Amino acid sequence: MENRTEMSQLRASKKDSKISHVLLMAIKLYLESGQPVGSKLLKETYCSDLSSATIRNYFAQLETDGFLRKNHISGGRIPTDLAFRYYADHCSPVLEQEEISIIQQKLKELPEYSKNIVKDLQKASEILSEILQLPVCFSSPRFESDSVTNIQLVSIDDLRVVFVLSTEFGQLFTDVLWLPEQLPENSLKRIESFLQNYLRKHPSSVPLSQKEEDLGMTLYNEVVVRYLTRYCHFSEEDLYQTGLSRLLKYEVFKDPETLAQGLSFFENRKHMCQLLNSHLHKKAPTTFIGRELSDIVGNADPSCAVITVPYYMDRTPLGAFGVLGPMNLPYQQVFGTLSLFTERLKTILTQSFYKFKLSFRRPCPTDPRCSQKPAELTRRSSIKLLPAKELT
């Protein structure tokens, strides 16, 4: 009796294995062709050891289990988000040698090491977006001992100006400030030049009135306090994104509603931080598909997928990259690309951190040490701006 039970379980196991193989091959064929998969075509390509009738029977069971749905026009089967989840969990990263060579050549655009960490991460995200032809975002902690290297003033209208601070590590800080009155022609440029020289401790290269100098220092001190406050007291990682227009090349995103859902999700800082941080200590990519994203954002099925992967300095995760695309992504190629990409980035970041003795901070939303007093902010920030006494 026990032998019969064991044989029955063995036959069931073999059948499940065959059904699993049919499902994986059907998804693979669908990803390659973009067309609904029929039993005859699947037999001719990947399942020659099975009859068309057997494949149809397996298709019927997979439909019942929610992995496939029937296309009413062609009669073929289309994978569901549950099927893509199964495929993402069971497929291995695969890249052709030619693809590996192209990726490695692209990654040579990144430096061997650099102090300009944020700028290099932004460059890396541009490269990854170009390779995958997909939108990419990444999270970043705050790096210590940064220095403001440049100041720019951009006029919006007669009474408003955009103040732009750029730092040695590639950070950008912008804010809109109000002017007390309309400035004469070229006055703003003279103030900008004065502040750039002041920042570098150089004598002013252009003559300006005492009124212009006083206004320049007022604007400077105001934006410094705002910058230090934001730098020291932040509740979320910094997020950067690129390549959103690349979604338009995919058929599913040509529908305005689907495109809007995908973009709104990708641009939602709270949701993206939640995804990027959820598997920060897992070195392999993590995939969120279809309804799994809907559970997070709390609205209709966005019909898209997000793949996240952390990036490391030595054995310490610094942040994560996220890739947005349709559910029918070429998962094997994406996983393989992300593996090469993060390994290269890990080497660069590790060398940079040890060479320049860099450090970083995580968000601290309730840290009582993050005082709002300007002098205290200056002491805590590790940002080279003004001495504390000039801010009190």
Curated annotation (Swiss-Prot):
The keyword Transcription applies. Keywords: Repressor, Stress response, Transcription, Transcription regulation. GO terms for biological process: negative regulation of DNA-templated transcription. One of its GO terms (molecular function) is DNA binding. InterPro entries: GAF-like_dom_sf, HrcA, HrcA_C, WH-like_DNA-bd_sf, WH_DNA-bd_sf. Coiled coil: none annotated. Signal peptide: none annotated. Belongs to the HrcA family. Negative regulator of class I heat shock genes (grpE-dnaK-dnaJ and groELS operons). Prevents heat-shock induction of these operons. HAMAP family: HrcA (MF_00081). NCBIfam families: hrcA (TIGR00331). This is Heat-inducible transcription repressor HrcA. The lineage of its organism: Bacteria, Pseudomonadati, Chlamydiota, Chlamydiia, Chlamydiales.
